[in-house]
Design a protein with these regions (language model features):
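Amphipathic, Lys/Arg-enriched alpha-helical "gate/interface" segment within cytosolic domains
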Residues: 1-132
Length: 132
């Protein structure tokens, strides 16, 4: 399942791998994040606890600061469905867009979050998780 919003934000799911992929590119607006939050809620509603999220922000230039509440909604939807881990790809730490701070409020200590600078490292981490 794949849904793309304005070519800036996309949400995909691979149920067989128990994986949700959230990608953002370019300049992302509040409206795009709001639409993505709704799509995340739809995609994860039938997921069993223990799935993984890959958040790919390699091509993100900027995100409206007013989108923070909708980022929180995405995190709450994932936490509510008992996501096991969130693996992020953020090549430039200056483009973190406050995800680490938001995570502290929306994810409990039982949700593992880890950030990588490269997609290759993130995929390696996901591969190691699936081997466990």
């Amino acid at each position: 399942m794949r849904m793309t919003f304005g070519n800036m934000y996309s949400v995909e799911a691979d149920r067989s791998k128990r994986l949700v992929v959230i990608s953002a590119a370019g300049r992302v607006s509040k409206e795009e994040v709001k639409a993505a939050a709704q799509e995340v809620r739809e995609i994860v509603k039938d997921f069993e606890p223990g799935f993984t999220v890959l958040a790919d922000f390699r091509w993100l230039d900027s995100m409206d600061s007013s989108s923070a509440p909708h980022i929180g909604e995405i995190m709450d939807a994932l936490a509510g469905k008992k996501v096991a881990s969130v693996v992020r790809v953020i090549p430039d730490p200056h483009k973190d867009i406050g995800l680490n701070i938001l995570s502290q409020f929306h994810y409990g200590p039982e949700i593992r979050t880890i950030t990588f600078e490269t997609l290759a490292d993130a995929l390696q981490s996901l591969s190691e998780e699936s081997d466990e």
